[in-house]
Regions:
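Metal-dependent nucleotidyltransferase catalytic core
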Residues: 2-3, 8-11, 48-75
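Helical scaffold of the NTase/Pol beta-like nucleotidyltransferase catalytic core
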Residues: 1-27
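Short, flexible, glycine/charge-rich loop motifs used to bind or transfer phosphoryl groups or to couple energy/partner
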Residues: 17-18, 34-37, 60-63
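Short amphipathic beta-strand starts and helix->beta connectors
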Residues: 24, 30-32, 56
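Residue-level signal for functionally critical sites in structured catalytic/ligand-binding pockets
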Residues: 26, 39-41, 61, 71
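Short connector loops at helix/strand junctions that flank enzyme active sites
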Residues: 22, 39-43, 65-67
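Catalytic metal-binding acidic patch
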Residues: 31, 36-53
Length: 75
């Protein structure tokens, strides 16, 4: 599924590393990037379960190596 998301591998790794740092149990990609019908400038929609959602969201927004915007929700 991530192969068709248009998200670079390094950004996926950064998100995974940050999720581990804040003890996020699950990160779910949803929206246009999950469906594969995204545009070049589409944001990255993520849902999280567990851990420190607020710090995770701030860290992802500030430290990942992409100019794309994130929309992160807590389940």
């Amino acid at each position: 599924m991530l192969q068709n998301s248009g998200i670079r591998d390094i950004v996926i790794k950064e998100i995974c590393d940050i999720a581990e740092k804040y003890e996020i149990e699950k990160v779910i990609l949803f929206g246009s990037r999950a469906r594969g019908d995204y545009k070049k400038t589409s944001d990255i929609d993520l849902a999280t379960c567990g851990g420190n959602h607020v710090l995770f969201a701030l860290d992802v927004d500030e430290t990942t190596s992409t100019l794309l915007k994130f929309d992160i929700v807590n389940l």
